């Protein structure tokens, strides 16, 4: 595997290989001496055209724990602001010896385009409304860690399925690993084509009774301005994960959220930090999974 552009094109075996590698990477994070020399001498660049805290930091920490050097390009002060094209920026980084580039961009397909014109490995950290593969992989790893399997589980995804790159990558990954997918949200935020992959259930109170795992998507607040939801209060009433809704769920329900959370909108704080929640674990699992991605793409070696 040369690039990580999305889960739609990955095979089941490629997904499972990354999840398998993430387990020993998690062990590294938990031990006293966290750094290993696996990617010593390698250089990784991060190029974020959209604001990011946790994803950018997670990718950079993952690289450093594998002993790679990291070059973080500040888009706000770089040649990009002077009119340099994306292609020129990436080829310049490549000419400096950078071997992998982590990119986030607001336009669909940018990582795929760059992979066609660069010798460096391109890692998609989120492109428009298309995909967010590393987030889906860490979600899959977290489910596997808590449930021991993915195949046969009923996984409920709640929220704005239409615009969410997290939802799309999760749906591709879950379907390839044999999960039964249920989606729930306002009709205005559920695309027709999702019915090819998932059962659509507009009544969250009914959907949550069936679920083994619930992944609550962050609601982009501009959806209200666009008229796709009536109000945040109404969204919370019908699709917020509340303590009252949790009482209807299975005893061993697993709660996930990609973060950052809008508390009191898509999820209540007491649910986010309840004993069924693995939201904090997702953060540490994200570092482990991104270490596994680097190892897969950059020919990691054991020393």
From Swiss-Prot:
Instruction: List the GO cellular component terms.
Output: cytosol
InterPro entries given in the database record: Asp/Orn_carbamoyltranf_P-bd, Asp/Orn_carbamoylTrfase, Asp/Orn_carbamoylTrfase_sf, Asp_carbamoyltransf, Asp_carbamoyltransf_Asp/Orn-bd
Q: One Pfam family of this protein, by short name? A: OTCace_N
Coiled-coil ranges per UniProt: none
**Annotated Gene Ontology MF terms?**
amino acid binding; aspartate carbamoyltransferase activity
Single GO biological process annotation from the record = amino acid metabolic process
Q: In which pathway does it act?
A: Pyrimidine metabolism; UMP biosynthesis via de novo pathway; (S)-dihydroorotate from bicarbonate: step 2/3
What positions does the entry give for carbamoyl phosphate binding? 54-55, 104, 132, 135, 259-260
Q: What is its EC number?
A: 2.1.3.2
Q: Which reaction does it catalyse?
A: carbamoyl phosphate + L-aspartate = N-carbamoyl-L-aspartate + phosphate + H(+)
List residues binding L-aspartate. 82, 165, 218
Q: Which UniProt keywords apply?
A: Pyrimidine biosynthesis, Transferase
Q: Which Gene3D superfamilies match?
A: Aspartate/ornithine carbamoyltransferase
Please describe the quaternary structure of this protein: Heterododecamer (2C3:3R2) of six catalytic PyrB chains organized as two trimers (C3), and six regulatory PyrI chains organized as three dimers (R2).
Task performed by this protein: Catalyzes the condensation of carbamoyl phosphate and aspartate to form carbamoyl aspartate and inorganic phosphate, the committed step in the de novo pyrimidine nucleotide biosynthesis pathway.
Family note:
Belongs to the aspartate/ornithine carbamoyltransferase superfamily. ATCase family.
By what name is this protein known? Aspartate carbamoyltransferase catalytic subunit
Q: What is the lineage of its organism?
A: Bacteria, Pseudomonadati, Coprothermobacterota, Coprothermobacteria, Coprothermobacterales
Q: Which gene encodes it?
A: pyrB
